[in-house]
UniProtKB/Swiss-Prot annotation:
Similarity comment: Belongs to the NrdR family.
Protein name: Transcriptional repressor NrdR
Zinc finger extent (unnamed): 3-34
UniProt gene name: nrdR1
Cofactor: Zn(2+)
UniProt domain ATP-cone: residue ranges: 49-139
GO molecular function: ATP binding; DNA binding; zinc ion binding
Organism of derivation: Alteromonas mediterranea (strain DSM 17117 / CIP 110805 / LMG 28347 / Deep ecotype)
Cofactor note: Binds 1 zinc ion.
GO biological process per UniProt: negative regulation of DNA-templated transcription
Family matches, as Pfam families: ATP-cone, Zn_ribbon_NrdR
């Protein structure tokens, strides 16, 4: 790595530590020429698959959109922010594990519903009602009945 002070290429790692819950490595480096010290952060570049929407259009995976959808479904429910963040990490991991460059919005929606079913059943029904476009109260009842099975 190049020294940010003198642009020399030869630097030495003098300390490494895991940070960000093990998602990054913090390294203290020293330039072998000017002896200045600096910090670098290293993390894996994990490429998320693109999402193929119902109309056939494609868009990049949007973590903020996922978070907003989960928060909307979980509004006024007793689920901690920490659990929501764990859910997001798990969903992203499942998407990457498909090994595909593109995934359907249907697959993503089903993964979200499965996660919400385990997290909070009321939030699951809220999300399912929008995702599956429930037309009347009967469809709500059928979904709630399936939860009891």
């Amino acid at each position: 790595m190049f020294c940010p002070f003198c642009s020399e290429q030869e630097t030495k790692v003098i300390d490494s530590r895991l940070v960000a819950e093990g998602q990054q490595v913090r390294r203290r480096r020293e330039c072998m020429v000017c002896h200045e010290r600096f910090t670098t952060f290293e993390s894996a570049e994990l490429v998320m698959p693109r999402v193929i929407k119902r109309d056939g259009s494609r868009e990049p995976f949007n973590e903020d959109k996922l978070r907003a959808g989960l928060q909307r479904a979980l509004e006024k429910r007793p689920v901690s922010t920490e659990k929501v963040e764990q859910c997001i990490l798990s969903l992203k991991s499942q998407l990457r594990a498909t090994g595909e460059r593109e995934v359907s919005s249907e697959l993503l929606g089903n993964l979200i519903m499965k996660a919400l079913k385990e997290l909070d059943k009321v939030a699951y029904v809220r999300f399912a009602s929008v995702y599956r476009s429930f037309e009347d109260i009967r469809e709500f009842g059928e979904e709630i009945a399936r939860l009891g099975d």
